[in-house]
Amino acid sequence: MDKPLVIAGRSFQSRLLLGTGKFSSSEAMKRAIEASGSEVVTVALRRVELENPQDSILSAIDTSRYLLLPNTSGARDALEAVRLARLARAAGCEPWVKLEVTPDPHYLLPDPVETLKAAEILIKEGFIVLPYINADPILAKRLEDLGAATVMPLGSPIGSNRGIRTRDSIAIIIEKANVPVVVDAGLGAPSHAAEAMEMGADAVLVNTAIAVAGDPEAMAKAFRKGVEAGREAYLAGLGSTRATAEASSPLTGFLR
C-alpha cells in the first residue's frame, strides 16, 4: 500500500501539484483543480492581490481544502524573491513558498546561485522552501543540506510541454535525495507525468499543459490518472531493460 506524500511534516494524498497560470477564466481553473484531485495549488505572487478576498484567482481556491503555495515567479534575483515571499507571509499566507528565480525571460531557466542565496535567507526566517531548479544533482543536495523541504528539478523549460529532457540528471537527484523530489516544468502530457512517477519522483507540478488544453477539466483528470498509474508502476517494480530480445514464451519443447 502506498504512503502519503509528506512535505515538511504535512501529508498529502495527491502527488499532483497544480499551477494556476494561463487558464481562460477562474471558473475553468476551479473546475480543473477539482478534477485534478490536487491538494497543493501554487499562485504567482505577481498575479494576485493577497489582501483582496475578491481577487479572481484567490476567490476560486478554497483554502480549507487546498494548500495555497505562493511562488516567486518573475523574481530576477535573490532579494526580489525574498521580498515577494515576505509580502505573502505578511498578508497572512502560510510560510510556504515555491522559490523561483528566473532572470532570463526567454527560457525562464532558474538561476542556481541566486536560488541558493534566497533559499538560505528564507529558511533562516522560518519559511518552508520548495525551490525550482535546473536538474543539477549537486545543487539539489546543497539545497537539501540548507533545509529545503523539497527539490523541484525541471523536466524541460517552463511552458514548453517538451517532457522530461533531463532524465539522467533527475534520476541521480531521485537516487540521492532525502527530501521529496517534485518534477516541475515542461510536462506537456499525462504520459510525461507518468514517466516522472515511474522513475521514482515523489510528485509532479503541472500548469500549462492543463491550462491551455482544449478541455482543461478533462486534461486535469487525465494527468491525475497519469500520476496515479506512474506511481503504481513504480511501486510494482518495473522490469529491467535489455539490448536484446527475450522471449516471453519458451522456444523449446513445442508440441509435435
From Swiss-Prot:
Compartments in which it is found: Cytoplasm
Family: Belongs to the ThiG family.
Pathway where it operates: Cofactor biosynthesis; thiamine diphosphate biosynthesis
Keyword set includes Cytoplasm: yes
First-tier enzyme category under EC: transferase
Protein name: Thiazole synthase
Enzyme Commission designation: 2.8.1.10
GO MF term (any one): thiazole synthase activity
Cellular component terms per the entry's GO annotation: cytoplasm
Domain of life, per lineage: Bacteria
Gene3D superfamilies given in the database record: Aldolase class I
GO biological process: thiamine diphosphate biosynthetic process
Keywords: Cytoplasm, Schiff base, Thiamine biosynthesis, Transferase
Catalytic activity line of the entry: [ThiS sulfur-carrier protein]-C-terminal-Gly-aminoethanethioate + 2-iminoacetate + 1-deoxy-D-xylulose 5-phosphate = [ThiS sulfur-carrier protein]-C-terminal Gly-Gly + 2-[(2R,5Z)-2-carboxy-4-methylthiazol-5(2H)-ylidene]ethyl phosphate + 2 H2O + H(+)
A Pfam short name: ThiG
Binding positions for 1-deoxy-D-xylulose 5-phosphate per the UniProt entry: G159, A185, G186, N207, T208
PANTHER family for this protein: THIAZOLE SYNTHASE
UniProt xrefs under HAMAP family: ThiG
